[in-house]
């Protein structure tokens, strides 16, 4: 079964790069540039196995989106990315049970390894 990943970030270059790497690893990918767009995907059917989410988004933080997802009993795993780490964000991410926390910039192989550790291999990999 092909695992699904939603990438949420307003930096289009990052979205394209991460999408490409995860597609190559065999994951089904969707992308959103804001929390509002992400919600349209997240509450759809079937659910995503994983959400890779930037904390700094237009109008709303990634932490705020995670809070709503957890309140709505969304079971997707979450990797929170941030270039602006603060003790408050890190603490809130832990409280909301964010599965992984990545500081930007990060090595793409680290991201792929984290994705695999959380939801397993992609399946249907073009890489073989």
Model segments located where?
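Two-component/phosphorelay signaling modules centered on CheY-like receiver
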Residues: 12-30, 96
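The feature encodes the CheY-like receiver
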Residues: 15, 58, 86
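Acidic, metal-coordinating helix/loop segments flanking the phosphotransfer/catalytic sites
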Residues: 31-50
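Acidic catalytic/metal-coordinating carboxylates
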Residues: 33-34, 61-64
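Short amphipathic alpha-helix used as the core "switch/output" element in two-component signaling
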Residues: 63-74
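Alpha4 helix (beta4-alpha4-beta5 surface) of REC/receiver domains from two-component response regulators
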Residues: 64, 85-100
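C-terminal output helix
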Residues: 88, 106-115
């Amino acid at each position: 079964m092909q695992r699904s990943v939603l990438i949420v970030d307003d930096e289009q270059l990052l979205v394209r790069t991460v999408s490409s790497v995860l597609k190559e690893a065999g994951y089904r990918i969707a992308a959103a540039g804001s929390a509002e767009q992400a919600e349209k995907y997240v509450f759809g059917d079937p659910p995503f196995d994983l959400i890779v989410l930037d904390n700094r988004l237009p109008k709303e933080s990634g932490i705020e989106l995670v809070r709503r997802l957890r309140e709505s009993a969304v079971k997707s795993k979450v990797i929170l990315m941030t270039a602006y780490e603060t003790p408050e964000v890190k603490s809130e991410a832990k409280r909301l049970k964010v599965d992984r926390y990545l500081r930007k910039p990060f090595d793409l192989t680290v991201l792929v390894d984290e994705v695999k550790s959380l939801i397993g291999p992609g399946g249907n990999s073009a890489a073989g």
